[in-house]
Amino acid sequence: MVVAAGSKFNLRRGNSGSCSSHNNVVINDRDGGEFSRRNKSGCFSSMVEVDKDPSCVSFTTFNILAPIYKRIDPQNQGVRESDCRSFWLARNQRILDSLLSESSSIMCLQEFWVGNEELVHMYEERLGDAGYQLFKLARTNNRGDGLLTAIRKDHLSIVNYRELLFNDCGDRVAQLLHVQSVNPILQNQKDSLNQEFLIVNTHLLFPHDSSLSIVRLDQVYQILQYVELYQRENRLKPMPIILCGDWNGSKRGHVYKFLRSQGFVSSYDIANQYTDSYADAHKWVSHRNHRGNICGVDFIWLYNPNQARKPMKTSWAEAVFSILKFQLRKASLSEDDAFTFLKGDNCTDSVTYISFSEALRKVKLIGVPYGLCFQQLQDLWNQADVDGNGVIDFEEFKQKIWNSTCSEHVCMEDSNPEQEQEAIGFKVKNAMLFPREMEKGLWPEDYSLSDHARLTCVFSPAKMSCSSL
């Protein structure tokens, strides 16, 4: 992992030529504008909400589908929108119209075409003129796209900005911003208080293969580790953490469950009173992928400082064991067969470190460029070997691997009131997807602004008590 602050990138100019006509190309869009409806909580659009209450903060996350990836001719899959300047220019103007009509406090965009100077300038000019400060980050290895985070300067000021480069097989990156409100949220004759919080914008690897689950989990693990390191090194007081982006995984996935075990909640689900149950897992969608499948993958995660969280390494190990179990069940192995598989050629009725390592190699969790490193393997083994006797017996296997779940709910431990302090967190006031059909689990066929929905959430400040430790 390489962490870089304020890196500079050379932007490449894309094809600026006009495009000849292509058959079966749909360019009409449900551009949308301001939200003109209420949801069940009775809230209006984010812009209206923040104007009514300046202490509110609104977030928008949107994968805007880079022109280098957008296919525009069903008869010729090799033709991309980046080949047709008039197409990508018009679509991105409509994207900007949509974003500016919403006018959120924070915009987190993914698949931003950093490799095209004209498009970059268009976003810088229009968002800059609207009062936004922009932060761009290209994916590694000159992939062409990256992230863009825009902050409204009349709402928020930047305390710090950091960049996280995973340097993995997906060339993924993340942005970390430490911001505070421009106007005090609490004020009296003696002092005033400005709200501070941390924002992450990222775009996780697409799970082209189930073996890539370990990479996606590691990306999230690195993000949380880096956020924790930043908080510790800067001796920050307890504050909310918001993770925005395209997570390329649904509510049933390992990443979702890992984040839930770390105290994060999906803002959209909270606003709509959806649970983690299977029945609520498919109530909404936000993406139609290149395979034609629709699912909900775009999230604005909220962690409040009063939330309990498991030790991160424990949650991570539970998630890896869950991935291991999935791979074993994918091979149609029963509980007994799975234990035998982990034992390998070992004659005793237990799993040794060597046989455990070999089993993980066979299911592609180690021994591949994107697999677990040596230290991670050691950490995993230490979690599984409960009694520390150097082997995993059948009971430990059942407890830690076969019957283990990445618990999505963490109970608050008893705390000492003398060790508590007051903090300012966030309350979810509203959250909306556009187009609206996606809130019903439907994908509108005439929507072509992107292959993702735009997700916007509105938060209001809330006092809460949290541990000072």
Short names for language-model regions:
Residues 208, 213-228:
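Active-site beta-loop-alpha substructure in enzyme catalytic cores
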Residues 64-90, 208-215:
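Acidic/histidine-rich helix-loop elements
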Residues 16, 24-56, 62-64, 88, ...:
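Structured beta-strand-rich core segments of catalytic domains in phosphoester-bond hydrolases
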Residues 57-65, 90-121, 150, 177, ...:
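Active-site beta-strand/loop signature of hydrolases that rely on acidic residues for catalysis
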Residues 2-49, 169, 181-187, 221, ...:
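Metal-dependent phosphoester-hydrolase catalytic domains
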Residues 76-78, 123-128, 168, 217-218, ...:
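Glycine-rich, phosphate-binding/catalytic loops in enzymes
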Residues 77-83, 106, 206-209, 321-324, ...:
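Short interface patches used for recognition in eukaryotic signaling and trafficking proteins
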Residues 70-75, 120-122, 145-147, 174, ...:
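Short aromatic-enriched loop/helix-cap "lid" or pocket-rim segments at secondary-structure transitions
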